[in-house]
Amino acid sequence: MISSLLLASACVPAWGSHAYALWGEPRYAEGFSHFDYVNAKAPKGGELRLVSNLRISTFDKYNPFTIKGSSPAYLAELMFDTLLWPSLDETATGYGLLAEDVQAAADGLSATFRLRPQARFHNGKPVLAADVKFSYDTLVGPHALPGYRTLFFDVAGVDVLDERTVRFRFKQPNRELPLTVGAIPVFSRDWGVENGKAKPFDQVVMDIPIGSGPYK
């Protein structure tokens, strides 16, 4: 019993940092309120109209991660949060967004993220480690854009360590990989579930996305 408890505790890391920097130290200290280039007092509300950056004037699906069809411009960026968020006044640095902490292993073969307890999807459910693993498994699966399999080629797998802790294992040491997996869009396991059964991802077409981003 004691040995099993010790083994379980050994799987969960001592926590690292609020940010991950490829070079040097993060510019912003833990607990910072906003990036320097952001106007924290900017008025809220109103309507924002964005012009598509593609030669597409319409859309026929809400799923931006599958091959067939066209989704609205910027949908992925506006509706789905990521584990880390890059700052625009630094090079190769990510700060915790869905994740409150990130730890890169000393041997470079894994990165572990602890999720914020207050992180919620648009349906009110908490963002859990199982959702992160589900998002990864779905994006590298046969029904998603093949570019994701290329992007995550050096990821060996994803482990759910506990409800709020997820670990990405790497095939070989690469200091950029924590930033790569930190940018994965996270969506709910409930997205595409119909009558209690999950549809194949390429059949999730007009189902309203269940993300945690600023827009829904």
Give names to the regions the model predicted:
Residues 2-10:
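Bacterial N-terminal signal peptides
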Residues 15-107, 137, 208-214:
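N-terminal lobe/hinge region of extracytoplasmic solute-binding protein
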Residues 27, 78, 97, 127, ...:
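Extracytoplasmic/secreted proteins, especially bacterial periplasmic and envelope-associated proteins
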Residues 37, 84-88, 107, 120, ...:
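Sec-exported extracytoplasmic/periplasmic mature domains
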Residues 49, 128-135, 163-169, 213-214:
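Alpha-helical secondary-structure segments
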Residues 107, 111-113:
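N-terminal cofactor/phosphate-binding cores enriched in small/glycine residues
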Residues 114, 150-195, 214:
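Surface-exposed binding/hinge segments that line
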